[in-house]
């Protein structure tokens, strides 16, 4: 007998792929009008379970009930037509079409033989008004922020009269203010009786927005608890199967002499303004700042992705020319980019290709062919030294968890033996267990005398991993502090130092929310 309070019941779901049991007898029950968080390390089976719900995968065994009725969706369209929607982490929109086109694509309202644009506009406006979404239905999607694109996807789910909406890492690219707006929308949906399945690695958010939390590990159901009964420590223990006594490894590297000096660095657009700092061998230098502080732009200018306007980059006491990425690479610089899936990996290609791509010319033989033996050897070095979990070198990198993808991205650069490693949000979208492994790896690299510059939006991460923290505000350095002696409040105040009255209103609001 099915519990009438549950809108969704997935019972004893199992799913196998060749050589892998991705789901093993998993049960998930979601109440009507609730926010039910789904948590687990990457590879725990969360996405596979949701793909079984959404008709992308078909389970080998188990049953799915919605409102007490057994369902078996043939595909995602079948799921949508029956009130199940999914807002994916990677937003899939036609950017050159307008917002309402994207909302109603493939099911335009008709007036005779023609599309009824007025009805389409009115229906879109009504949904936006109900959800407090401030977007013009006639704007091109390409003009929207990531947050606005996400709101459009949620509105699209509502337009299908969805009873269940799955949100996969919905806040991974949002500011605190945008997260707050998203939570207001989620609460409106909850009041309308819509159930939200919320997938996230951000434990603070889970505890704030969720009614119940289900935790998975290694393809199995581990626990379902009321969010109010959980703590961050208990969630971590359930997720990883052990206690993480410390969120960050011990800082046992010792910074040595100065290896890099950056003097009055500005970019050609003058968004960076006279950035100066020093980096020592074996040092981890964090870069903090609010959205718009130009942290990523600093790394891109150092690496030659962004044109330098003025200033000097001095390595081992000598000026170096990093005007192009290939020159920066020759000078011993490496950049792990913020958007791993877009700019860090070739998702549809195997691990071996992704491991050697940053150094591919060195694998060419005199005949112009690739030395497959060396490629295999070096790929195995990346897999072993980075502790990558994969069945094969030929596994498509896009099929791996975010943590394993990031390890390969770092490993490919280490094959070049860089001296300066630039890390832009290195743990974004990575679960708590894999984060600890990345922190350990960064610490080990510092012990090997690499100079490391690390951008992060997570304040505890900067304080827990770095030796010093350079704080940026509106393209300028507003202070450099010792990580062991500073506080989050000091860093936040430094982040606001150069905000203008007109240009920094949104960021100033972030300061008020955080401090």
From Swiss-Prot:
EC number, as in UniProt: 7.5.2.11
Subcellular locations according to the entry: Cell membrane
Pfam families xref list: ABC_tran
UniProt membrane topology term: Peripheral membrane protein
UniProt xrefs under PROSITE patterns: ABC_TRANSPORTER_1, ABC_TRANSPORTER_2, MGLA
Protein residues bound to ATP: 40-47
A GO term from the CC aspect: plasma membrane
Reaction(s) catalysed by this chain's protein: D-galactose(out) + ATP + H2O = D-galactose(in) + ADP + phosphate + H(+); methyl beta-D-galactoside(out) + ATP + H2O = methyl beta-D-galactoside(in) + ADP + phosphate + H(+)
Domain ABC transporter: 8-243, 254-499
Keyword terms of this UniProt record: ATP-binding, Cell membrane, Membrane, Nucleotide-binding, Repeat, Sugar transport, Translocase, Transport
GO MF annotations in UniProt: ATP binding; ATP hydrolysis activity
Chief location category: membrane
Superkingdom of source: Bacteria
PANTHER family noted in UniProt: CARBOHYDRATE TRANSPORT ATP-BINDING PROTEIN MG119-RELATED, GALACTOSE_METHYL GALACTOSIDE IMPORT ATP-BINDING PROTEIN MGLA
Subunit: The complex is composed of one ATP-binding protein (MglA), two transmembrane proteins (MglC) and a solute-binding protein (MglB).
Role played: Part of the ABC transporter complex MglABC involved in galactose/methyl galactoside import. Responsible for energy coupling to the transport system.
Family indicated by similarity: Belongs to the ABC transporter superfamily. Galactose/methyl galactoside importer (TC 3.A.1.2.3) family.
Protein's name in the database: Galactose/methyl galactoside import ATP-binding protein MglA
Natural source organism: Clostridium perfringens (strain ATCC 13124 / DSM 756 / JCM 1290 / NCIMB 6125 / NCTC 8237 / Type A)
